[in-house]
Amino acid sequence: MSRGLGDVYKRQDTVPAGSNGVVFTPWLHGNRCPFEDPNAAGMFFNIRLETGKTELIRSVVEGICFHMKWMYERQGLKVKTSDAVRFCGGGALGETTCQILADILEKDVVVVESPQNIGAVGAAACIAVGMGLVNSMKDVKKLIPVKTTYHPNTANRAAYERNFKVFKNLYKCNKQNFAILNGQE
């Protein structure tokens, strides 16, 4: 039985990249980006009798990362994106989650100390600059050390490219079904 996030993070390690073909769409409350559709809904796709909860757990993380990749791709059409992505929040506490994100984005993922508190750290940094305790926002960078950088594992690329293609097609193929079930046809 799972006792907390630490156990969930460890369980992801037991499933190969691509979650044995299971794909999760994280649109549990509709979606706004990269497409706007309040009727879009979450789903697990390609579940079989052999599918276990560990595949489902990993597919949820992969699905969230696929959605981030899709947004990142769209953003890249309008503005230059950085070579590395800074990952913050509670999700950044899981090493496997960070590696999955790096693999799916095909970018380095940088995690700072206490990533779950980075919002408060950022607010404190702004106050410190405003009060003159720190000279500039550039100086703040020195105060927030990078803990780890995760590099994409090219061995996982084929599985993730396959699942990402399916992920995007799931929306295209189900857009009308979402409207029928959840909104206006």
Show which residues each predicted segment covers.
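N-terminally biased helix-coil "hinge/interface" segments that flank
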Residues: 10, 18, 73, 77, ...
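Glycine-rich phosphate-binding/hydrolytic loop that grips phosphoryl groups
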Residues: 58, 62, 99-102, 114-143
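Single conserved hydrophobic/aromatic residue that forms the stacking wall/gate
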Residues: 1-9
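Activation-segment/catalytic-loop signature of the eukaryotic protein kinase fold
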Residues: 19-111
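Short beta-alpha connecting loops at secondary-structure transitions
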Residues: 45, 105-112, 145-156
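Acidic, glycine/GT-rich loop-and beta-edge segments that sit at the periphery of enzyme/chaperone cores
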Residues: 3, 131-185
